[in-house]
Amino acid sequence: ASVLNAYSLVNSQGVYGGQRRAAPDQRVFVLTRSAYAGQQRYAAATWSGDVTSTWTALRQQVAGGLGFSLSGIPYLTVDIGGFSVPGRFSRKDPLPEDAEEWRELNTRWFQYGTFLPLTRVHGEVPKREMWEMGGESHPAYQAHLKFDRLRYRMLPYVYSLAGGVTHESGTFLRPLVMDFPSDAAARRVADQYLF
């Protein structure tokens, strides 16, 4: 029987096998835009690609991540803050209201990213580092710092979840329907999950 659209699985398998042969004593990690059920066995994690830096895209990332989880693909990450930035945010001297909206959007995205299997900030302009969010006294900086510290405190828990993925067919993101399958309301919720 032939398998259609298995590119990601075969690609991840090839990269994994090549890395294991080249460096058998080192762990392998494959970050890929493509996805296929079972690719996690080859140390592959999917990221959602170069999405736009908008509120709509942030909402879509949450729903998309839950879809990945329900599809049996547990390792997911995003470009926190988005990657393709609207011009009003990326100007050399953005309007004050645009700069403030960027900080708020980036902060909310960072908070979401704290509760993903892989927390990953990525992008160029505007800067996404917490110290670029308006200085140490700015609420955006303080929120980034708080959630960064929270993520580090959660690392033992995240490692435990990873063990559950490997040994118990678990997942990181659990849409409400996974824990409350008899609840009709939980089946309709596409923007909340347990971690």
Predicted regions and their residues:
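Catalytic-domain carbohydrate-binding cleft regions of carbohydrate-active enzymes
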Residues: 1-195
